[in-house]
Amino acid sequence: MSSSVDPSAEDYRREMCTYNQFMEPIYRQALAHLPFQGSVGGLDAGCGPGGLLPSLCHLIGDEGEIMALDASLAHLEAAQQLCEHKELTSRVTLKQADLRTTLPFADDRFDWVWVADVLHPGYFPTPDDPVSEFVRVTRPGGHVVIFFEKMYESKLFPGQPHLDTLYRRYLDYHGRKLTFDNQPNNLHIWLKRSGCEAVQIHAFTMIHASPLTSEVRYYLQDIVVGWFAKTPMDKVTAAGISEDEWNALLQAVAPESPDCVFDHPDYYCMWIALMAIGRKPT
Ligand SMILES: C[S@@+](CC[C@H](N)C(=O)[O-])C[C@H]1O[C@@H](n2cnc3c(N)ncnc32)[C@H](O)[C@@H]1O
């Protein structure tokens, strides 16, 4: 397994906490499908700053414990603070590990493995490798669950076809290097190829509508728009978008603009996530 990126060097805990708040309506739906209730021990692989640990602890019940792994020490530090704040330190063990290597656990150790928004193709060009490791450390009859937000299929400008088409073109260009094997829409296939049975795939949607809460507004404005607004013009034109079209798109989301879409009383965005659940054969 290899990647040019060293995830331990990255610290985006503030963005992750806002992202977790933004995604809350989808997490509620996703968690309701998890077969984790009453389990003794699970693994949160790529736990980040730990935003989902309180919900996972609540879901499994008072007896359950969670091992939470991440490569980033900064994220683990934030997760530690969160666990202290939520009085979960006796139930959660945090550990630094690289998911691109063999996991430091015996075969069949956990009842379940949960991995949310981690197996991005840029970090994991061959997701079958970590997924096989997740299956190895899960007990027979236990479950491996892969969750992915699908920003590329989500809608930032529903009802505004011109902006939506431009944004879609930008996202399509951005995702052009994905292959069948590492495309996150195929997360259920990763589980099947790694030997799981009874694989199910679920889709979840949510809408954030005007008036947006300050967290949602911050996520859309500073993180989503902040991400694409930084794109150099040569990459924008390579995506088939002219400079004028791009400026119109940026103007529509500029916070100081009187026409900023996020301030419109009828604005809404629609987000999508996918989740696949597989069972390790007994
Ligand atoms: C987008 S965050 C998701 C965090 C968390 N699962 C959540 O949903 O809130 C991705 C996390 O994966 C971690 N990560 C990325 N590559 C990794 C690797 N090779 N080994 C361990 N963790 C990794 C990052 O440090 C980051 O915390």
What do the PLM-derived regions correspond to, one by one?
Residues S4-V5, Y12, H202-P265:
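C-terminal helical/coil "lid" or tail adjacent to the Rossmann-like core of SAM-dependent
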Residues D128-P140:
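A short glycine-rich, Lys/Arg-flanked "PGG" loop and its adjoining helix->strand segment in the class I
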Residues D111-T126:
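A short SAM/SAH-binding and catalytic strip from SAM-dependent methyltransferases
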Residues S2-E24:
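Class I SAM-dependent methyltransferase Rossmann-like catalytic core
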Residues L103-V113:
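A short acidic, Gly/Pro-enriched loop at the edge of an enzyme's catalytic core
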Residues V145-Y218, D222:
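Conserved catalytic/acceptor-binding region of the Class I
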Residues L43-A45, P49-T101:
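Class I SAM-dependent methyltransferase SAM/SAH-binding core
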Residues Q21-V40, S55:
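Conserved alpha-helix/loop element of class I SAM-dependent methyltransferases that forms part
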